[in-house]
Structure formats: structure tokens, C-alpha cells
């Protein structure tokens, strides 16, 4: 543990590290290898493994650690309704294709994605029940409701307009898989996958995640060309969009957590007429970008003009 924390400190010198542990580990911390080093590198956040593990139990050990290791940072908590499972039991369940009920979806997804704890899933042939948590593991926490909302909106739109519901769900789950990356990381992916960029895209971070996300979706998850294109065009749109591309563009635009002037009217129009909804969404985007003094991508202009005839 001390070696791991030392490495993490070198990799993340500006971050504050905390080591989470249950009651049994907390009560024996002084017997670990290099406890003083551990406590100098990270704070300790200990939680009760059962409801019987009260503050009274924690306080004696906490006071001892403070006396013995003055530099220690310790936070203890009790969790109502806690379920008792050991890390050993959880690892065993994961190796047997179980364990998901004990973990936050994004955490479970990260374990599957990185093949940790003897999990051996084929990322290119995941059922939706596993693709969803893996997709969520790519996101910042605050973006998770948006992606889940986009999936649900994509289902409704696909059912309404006869697009492939399964493909709409996959595209929705993966459409923002590279959204959290910075410009340097986005450009590195573009270089890796041979993605050619125009002058606007080279400067507009918001536009890049659609293309790099499509590349990751195809390379890592093995999506087909229809899903690839739906992710590729979900930010700008383009002339002659397929039904799936339209569904993806609009699901991203009007999903339930979106809240901006005109969104309710746009939602109404989208379910009255798909093309009218798409045209309205494109025009709203163009108006917003123009009002902000930002350039509008030519693909968006071409998509609008094609719909207007």
C-alpha cells in the first residue's frame, strides 16, 4: 500500500489522496507495512462494515493513531443500512461474472473495461447490461445523467420514427465517451485514428469529441458503420442524415435533463415531425452560435439548408 501511494503521489503531486477502508482494516492499520509512510501520503477515510461498528469503536483507534502519527488525517463514518461484504468476497463474485449489485455502475464498468479482478469480457460484444456501466466509466460524474437521459430519449425517438432501437441505445451510451478529454488528448486521438480536421475543428474542443468518440466506439466496442456515423455527426449534423443520425442528434439535444429557452417547444415538434424537429434544432444552434460570436461549422449550415430545400 505504501508503495502504491508513493507512486500515486508522484503521478498526482497536486491531488489530495484518501485511502478508504472498512472497520477491520482501520483497527489494524498500525500493523501494516510502513504505516507512518501511508499516513504521511494519504488521509484515512474509514467506514463501518456493519451497523454495530459505531463511533465509539472508531474513536479509540482514531485517538491512538493521532497520538502515534501526529501527521495523520483521519475521517470516520457510519453508514445506515450498510451491507456487509468483504473485498475478497467481491473479487470472487466478479471473477464469476457477478458482483455488480455491490458497486456503482461506473465503478463496475471500469473494472470490466480494464479486465480487473479476473473479469474477462469481450468489449466488442457486450450486452447492454454491461455496455451501459462500461460506457458510464468513461464519463465525469456530472455527465452520467445526460448520457442516461440521451439513451432513454433515443429509445423513444427510434420507436416513434422506426429507427433501430438497439443501435440508437448503443450510439447514445457511447456518444460522449471522449467528452472529458482536453484538447491535447483529443488531438492525440485524432492523430492515432487518422482523423482529418478542418480549421474550425482544430480550434473547437466541443466538436472533436464526436469524431474521437466514434473512433473509440468502433475500435474498442466494435460498433457498425451506422452507429459510428450516428456518433460522428451528433454534434454538427450534416446534409442527408439517416434516421438513426437524426435520432442521435435530437436525443442528445432534448433529453430530459436539458433545460434551455425553447426546449419544450423543440421536444413537442420533434415528436410531431422528425425533420421539422431537426430543422428547428439546427436553426436554434446556428442562432445561438451566431449570437455568441462563434463560427458555425459548415456541416451544420449544409444540414439546415438541405432540410429547408
Language-model segments: residues:
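Nucleotidyltransferase catalytic core that binds NTPs
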Residues: 1-127
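Solvent-exposed, amphipathic alpha-helical segments
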Residues: 89-93, 250, 288
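N-terminal polybasic phosphate/anion-binding patch
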Residues: 129, 139
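Divalent metal-dependent catalytic cores for phosphoryl transfer on phosphate-bearing substrates
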Residues: 133-137, 146, 155-282
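Metal-dependent nucleotide-binding catalytic modules
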Residues: 264-309
Amino acid at each position: 500500500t505504501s508503495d502504491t501511494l508513493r507512486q500515486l503521489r508522484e503521478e498526482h503531486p497536486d491531488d489530495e489522496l484518501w485511502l478508504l477502508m472498512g472497520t477491520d482494516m482501520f483497527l489494524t492499520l498500525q500493523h501494516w507495512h510502513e504505516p507512518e509512510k501511508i499516513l504521511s501520503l494519504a488521509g484515512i477515510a474509514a467506514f463501518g462494515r456493519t451497523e454495530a461498528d459505531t463511533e465509539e469503536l472508531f474513536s479509540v483507534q482514531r485517538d491512538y493513531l493521532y497520538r502515534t502519527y501526529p501527521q495523520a488525517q483521519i475521517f470516520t463514518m457510519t453508514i445506515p443500512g450498510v451491507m456487509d461484504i468483504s473485498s475478497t468476497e467481491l473479487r470472487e463474485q466478479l471473477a464469476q461474472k457477478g458482483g455488480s449489485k455491490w458497486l456503482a455502475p461506473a465503478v463496475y464498468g471500469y473494472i470490466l473495461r480494464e479486465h480487473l479482478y479476473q473479469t474477462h469480457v469481450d468489449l466488442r460484444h457486450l450486452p447492454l447490461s454491461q455496455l451501459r456501466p462500461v460506457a458510464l466509466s468513461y464519463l465525469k460524474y456530472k455527465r452520467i445523467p445526460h448520457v442516461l437521459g440521451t439513451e432513454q430519449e433515443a429509445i423513444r425517438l427510434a420507436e416513434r420514427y422506426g429507427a433501430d432501437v438497439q443501435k440508437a441505445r448503443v450510439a447514445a451510451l457511447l456518444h460522449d465517451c471522449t467528452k472529458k478529454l482536453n484538447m491535447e488528448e483529443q488531438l492525440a486521438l485524432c492523430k492515432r485514428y487518422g482523423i482529418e480536421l478542418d480549421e474550425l475543428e482544430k480550434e473547437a474542443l466541443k466538436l472533436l469529441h464526436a469524431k474521437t468518440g466514434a473512433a473509440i466506439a468502433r475500435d474498442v466496442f466494435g460498433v457498425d458503420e451506422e452507429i459510428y456515423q450516428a456518433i460522428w455527426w451528433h454534434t454538427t449534423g450534416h446534409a442527408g442524415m439517416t434516421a438513426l443520425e437524426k435520432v442521435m442528434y435530437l436525443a442528445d439535444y432534448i433529453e430530459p435533463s436539458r433545460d434551455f429557452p425553447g426546449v419544450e417547444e423543440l421536444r413537442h415538434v420533434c415528436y410531431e415531425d422528425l425533420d421539422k424537429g431537426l430543422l428547428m434544432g439546427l436553426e436554434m444552434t446556428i442562432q445561438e452560435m451566431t449570437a455568441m460570436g462563434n463560427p458555425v461549422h459548415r456541416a451544420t449550415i449544409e444540414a439546415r439548408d438541405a432540410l429547408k430545400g
